[in-house]
Amino acid sequence: MKKWIFIISLIIIIATALSLCNQKTVQYPLMQKESAITQIDIVEISGYRTVSTGNFDSIRVIKNIDPSENSVFLTSFYNLPCKKSFGPSQECLEGLAVRFFFQDGAFQLVGAETSFYCSADNNWSYIAYYFDYDAFHQYLLQHKGQEDK
């Protein structure tokens, strides 16, 4: 009897492991506290306004800051290595985009969401981070109304 219980348990464990391996997209809750990104440093590189984080070399602004939309889009350079914060099933990054959300009428950062494309499964996955709000707020005040180069 114990032998059958062991065999059935083993089959269930193997089936569960296989189903987890076949998942193509890793979903994360908004504003995940466990993110490795805890600080944003604003820098300028070759005329592009960039955000340097602990996970990526640089992120280039591709959309003007628009108060009416209460958001700004950033994009990273391609062919970045995947980081552990994206989950164990992600092996590579083809591209990354970041959108920051703000409260109406004021450049107070209230959220941020990134989406990344992994060529291993041809799917977009989403993850969100906490940022250094004060640093990015100062950046917005300094660059408000300026166009991207």
PLM regions with names:
Residues 3-10, 15-149:
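Function-determining sites in protein domains
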